[in-house]
Regions:
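Long, contiguous domain-sized segments
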Residues: 1-69, 73-74, 145-174, 180-391
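Short hydrophobic beta-strand that contains or immediately precedes a catalytic carboxylate
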Residues: 81-84
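Short, glycine/charge-rich beta-strand/loop segments that flank catalytic centers
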Residues: 86, 178
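Acidic, metal-ligating active-site segments
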Residues: 89-139
Length: 391
């Protein structure tokens, strides 16, 4: 039971500190905007400095003046938007059997020529030993947490591409929308055999999308990334070739690069972009992308009216002017139709989500079926207590 008086005191303290942080961030933002325009005026020298620098941060790669903006292109009258999302019932040793369920939903929205929509969700139950465990760096480990999340991501992508390819056969332009990053950063630091297994299937989806001319959009709402700000931090360093393993300013109270530390790209581009406009396409230096080949992921920031979002897309789409314009126009249009968030993704989420009551019903069904077959099944006292709490 919460002590609301104590909580209120802590909230008041938090709000006071947040106000002070906001004032500090405003100063950092002003400096970052100034630096952005300065480096844009000499952007080729800036690119050279970034190439010579060595940092421990993700630093955006730049191909043109970083303050360049692009106006909203016209969306094709005939276009199909496909989205996928998923949710899961996690495995639990407190339940009657070790099993997990993945529910993958797809949404297909046709615009123009009468429109139309198709919604589907497909539950998949995993219970065999080969489902619940995998070989991971020479060990056999249980599929749970991030490992389960990655499996779900691959299933979402497979369903997304399958539906997008089917829609492409109609002849209209097609965009495939995914909620979140296209960069599988979760694979960094994982065993090589596991990386290879996950990337093989993932990149096969991207390759199929490429062959069909279907751009995949990774839509990130309220992004916390700092790739572009980190590039500006390198620009603030007086050194010609900054090496942050041997920084001559690390003992300073406030090193030059720390002047805009903590600022997000979202705040930076909120001061630059107008509604409908996007930034240039930046490159990511995430190490896992070295394994992506022709599908290396780039990103741009887009002002959708209510917020700045990060849009990720494969290199083959970002270097194709027609596909890049299609991604720009569709991402913005979807956000408008969804009152700030893509309507296709919102619908896919609604189709995919497994609610608490459904989870309990799922395990009740499992228990009932096993008991019908004469099995002796038992939920742990802990879980039984949670389900039927009394005082």
């Amino acid at each position: 039971m919460l002590d609301l008086v104590e909580v209120n005191q802590q909230i008041t303290k938090m709000a006071t500190e947040d106000h002070l942080i906001a004032d500090d961030m405003a100063e950092r933002l002003a400096l970052a905007v100034e630096r952005l325009h300065l480096e844009s005026a000499r952007w080729q020298a800036f690119v050279d400095k970034l190439a010579m620098s060595k940092t421990s941060w993700l630093v955006a790669t730049i191909n043109e003046p970083p303050n360049r903006t692009y106006s909203l292109p016209r969306r094709p009258e005939m276009v199909t938007v496909v989205a996928a999302d998923g949710s899961q019932i996690m495995p639990s040793h407190h339940e009657v059997v070790p099993a997990f369920l993945l529910n993958i939903a797809t949404v297909v929205l046709h615009y123009g020529n009468g429109g139309g929509a198709a919604f589907a969700s497909t539950p998949s139950l995993f219970y065999r030993d080969e489902d619940l465990y995998l070989d991971y760096g020479g060990e056999r480990v249980q599929v749970t947490g991030d490992l389960l999340g990655l499996r779900r991501t691959l299933m979402e992508f497979g369903s997304l591409i399958e539906q997008a390819v089917a829609a492409r056969n109609g002849g209209d332009a097609v965009c495939a929308l995914s909620d979140g990053s296209l960069i599988l950063w979760q694979l960094e630091g994982r065993p090589p055999d596991y990386q290879e297994s996950m990337l093989t299937d993932y990149l096969a989806c991207l390759e199929q999308s490429n062959r069909q001319g279907i751009p995949i959009i990774g839509y990130i709402s309220r992004p916390r990334s700092r790739d572009v700000v980190n590039a500006l931090r390198v620009g603030l360093c007086p050194e010609e070739a900054p090496n942050y393993d041997h920084c001559p300013y690390e003992r300073d109270e406030r090193p030059p690069c720390a002047q805009i530390e903590g600022l997000t790209d979202r705040r930076l581009f909120a001061s630059l972009l107008k509604a409908g406009e996007r930034s240039q396409v930046f490159g990511s230096t995430s190490r896992i992308l070295d394994r992506y080949g022709a599908h290396r992921i780039g990103f741009f920031y887009l002002h959708v009216g209510s917020e700045i979002v990060r849009i990720e897309l494969p290199q083959w789409a970002s270097t194709n002017a027609a596909l890049l314009d299609l991604v720009h126009a569709v991402a913005y249009d979807q956000a408008q139709k969804g009152m700030g968030y893509p309507v296709a993704l919102a619908e896919a989420h609604q189709q995919a989500v497994v609610r608490g009551a459904e989870r309990d019903l799922f395990y009740d069904m499992v228990t009932a079926v096993f008991r019908q077959r004469g099995a002796v099944m038992a939920v742990s006292p802990k879980n039984l207590r949670k389900r039927r709490m009394t005082v």
